[in-house]
Swiss-Prot record:
NCBIfam families, sorted: AAC_6p_group_E, AAC_6p_Serra
Name of this chain's protein: Aminoglycoside N(6')-acetyltransferase type 1
Organism (species): Serratia marcescens
Entry function: Catalyzes the transfer of an acetyl group from acetyl-CoA to the 6'-amino group of aminoglycoside molecules conferring resistance to antibiotics containing the purpurosamine ring including amikacin, tobramycin, netilmicin, isepamicin and sisomicin.
GO molecular function annotations of the record: aminoglycoside 6'-N-acetyltransferase activity
Length: 146
């Protein structure tokens, strides 16, 4: 079953977020989660397995700036998607993406975008399996001033 993330399931959401983004502190994750819950331009969904435990999540945001490879605005942007290892290959990501797409359409979007690190081949395979088409490969640069 797919449910929207809310104040009643924060602990499970935090656990899944921490598994996907382990470098973030619990305090940082909680602050971002509060921002998502307070924003009309963001939402998050979780998947609950047959045993009642939450096993996967997806976060999505509306982006009004340019999104690489997209032709419309706003664009629904998949900020993160994760399935616990014990629940992989059971279709949870596909069910989450279906819910994300429905939300995006309700927000007036005609495109769903995402990104991943160029070295993250597992994520690239997942995106392809979920129906995403690669649009660009970009290298970012930085120069410190001072």
């Amino acid at each position: 079953m797919i449910v929207i993330c809310d104040h009643d399931n924060l602990d499970a959401w935090l656990a899944l977020r921490t598994a996907l983004w382990p470098s973030g502190s619990p305090e940082d994750h909680r602050a971002e989660m509060r921002e998502i819950l307070a924003s009309p331009h963001h939402t998050a969904f979780m998947a609950r397995g047959l045993d009642g435990a939450f096993v996967a999540f997806a976060e999505v945001a509306l982006r009004y700036d340019y999104v690489n490879g997209c032709e419309s605005s706003p664009v629904a942007f998949l900020e993160g998607i994760y399935t616990a290892e014990r629940a992989r290959r059971q279709g949870w990501a596909a069910r989450l993406i279906a819910q994300v797409q429905e939300w995006a359409k309700q927000q007036g979007c005609s495109e769903l975008a995402s990104d991943t690190d160029i070295a993250n081949l597992d994520s690239q395979r997942l995106h392809a399996a979920l129906g995403f088409a690669e649009t660009e490969r970009v290298v970012f640069y930085r120069k410190t001033l001072g």
